[in-house]
Amino acid sequence: VKEGVFSEEWRKSVHILMGGFALLLRYLPWWAAALLAAGAVISNATWIPKLQGGALMRASETESLLRSGVWLYSFSILMLLVVFPQHLEVVAGAWGVLAFGDGFATLAGKGIGGPKLPWSAQKTWAGSTVFFGAGTLGGAAFGWWVASGTQSPAPSFRKMLLISGCAALACAIVESLSLKLNDNLSVPFLAAGLFYSLQQLDPAIWQASSAQLRHDFLVGLAVNLVFAFTARALRAVSWSGVAGGLLVGITITTFGGLSAFGVLAFFFVLGSAATRLGYAGKARRGIAQERGGARGAVHALANCSVAAYLAFLAGSLPSELQAGLWLAFVASLATAACDTLGSEIGPLASGQPF
């Protein structure tokens, strides 16, 4: 590594190697792990960025700690320790997905290259595939290692591998969307949330309601097909939007029935109407939604994937948790709809912005 010259390879090597500290969570008490993480937060804000003349840091990261992936990495781990003090296996699993999935994905994307993802010109199929594979193995290994030393009975490696695979897949998709949120925040928090919630699932609930789930799935399939193709005919969505909408819509209807679908449909119609409102004027000013206002799969997943997962949890967890989950389901869709309304109607207002 040349002094003062940024090296992506060195940065990601450090990113991956730091994941090894997650193995210590099997032996460390919570307070000791939190103190070490706090020390890392301080170090990554002070002397670590100066190593090799700043070769670990991208140029854009020198302006603010909130833009520094190096600092956000350690900050995320500290926050996970604060949120999950009794579930260090969750922290370890999420850490494994972050260290191995995100780390090896960048190296593979640059080293292997290959075709780009249809929805992101900056990401490759190779990178996302490696993210999923490496993240799955890293998360499962770290999560199981810590759980086997801190829980009794410990979950099987097979169960942890399945949970880690779901978390890594979700994180790989989020990472591929090139969101403004730094990957060192989005990946560990999403992975930890999935590790924790998926461990709480009760298969007995699915067995008891299997007939109802099959019925709601078939109803959801029919209703969502009609709704999606109607939206396509009205040019409210693109073909990728049809696919993304079917995925989240069928999931929501299967676990929440037609009432949950009605909430989804209401907010979709509301957002689509706001997009069409004053579209010609917005197009002349260059601020209109592209493709004539048709939303794609990225929009469907960004706006509705949280709601779909909450619906899945509401249908898979004990009844005492369901009211809160359905409230969160409505809130997540309302938040996405309000964001759309603000961005579509706001530009139509006259006067100076705040």
What are the residue ranges of the model-derived segments?
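Hydrophobic alpha-helical transmembrane segments
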Residues: 1-119, 124, 128-354
